[in-house]
Amino acid sequence: MLNSMIYNYIKSLELQGLAVHDGEPAIFEQQAPEDTDPGWEGMQYGRVVYDLRMQDDPARKVSGSLRIMAAYTDAEELKLAEHLLQEAFDRTFFSSDLTIATTWQKTAPSVTSDMDVFGSILYFDVEAFPVKRYVPLDPVRSLAGYIKDIFPDVWMIGQEEQARIWKPGQGIPGTAVYVLMDSCSAGSFPSTYACTWHMAVLRVLVITASYDEANQILGILQARLLEKERFPMEDGSPFFVERVSTAQNNDVLKRGQMQLQGQFGILRETEPTTSIQGIEMTGGWK
């Protein structure tokens, strides 16, 4: 579905000078048809070919790259297409069954076999924002819900099922937040017969159009967490906040700006018991 979203997004840019193939603008996934293909209607250029490649990432499970190749016989049309494609895909989020963000890395000339064709390849890094669920209690989902209560107008990535293409600061919502778990281990609180304690380290990514907007949201959230020293889990039990730290960095989409550490308890399941049947006591003490 992401590939079809990217296709429709490029199509919506209405790039000038695109050829026509089978009645549609010459936009293709991975590879363009041969120049001799009967689907071409007149000229075979300009054209755009995109290639989205995803790979496993131990930290986030999925990441990858996006390459967009543009080829034109008119150098000025190529230059305009480069500008529009870079602007359209830099810091842009695509959300369907998976949410990804594309960030422009570089643009390089593309060598073509036809000397009359000018080509460029735009390279984009792809960062994935996978949805992970934790049972029986989910601190990620619980913190995301807590943040949504404080900031109802933000888009909580991974928590709201809605296909969308989004750029920070453009339209409503103008801000997105993503929560993920760094680690979960045995807690330092003593566990009991009724409850086991777990320590979780969570990260919060606030994606906005400016550092000032992000800092404002982070400041409010940090003050609230430090004041309350807890937030509610899905079952109403508390997540006890022990430490909150914030820092701006150059890799917001990867590391985020806030790290939170705390503990939560999970009630043990009561094992069913059965009474002993069929035993009769006879006789007595002598």
Model regions: which residues?
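Small/polar-rich, solvent-exposed N-terminal microdomains that initiate assembly or binding
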Residues: 1-58, 79, 83, 87, ...
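Helix N-terminus capping/helix-initiation residues
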Residues: 12-13, 112, 210
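Hydrophobic beta-strand residues in large extracellular and virion-surface proteins
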Residues: 6, 10, 50, 66-68, ...
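Short, charged interaction patches at domain edges and termini
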Residues: 1-9, 53-61, 98-153, 184-199, ...
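Extracellular/virion structural assembly segments
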Residues: 59-67, 71-95, 102-105, 192-201, ...
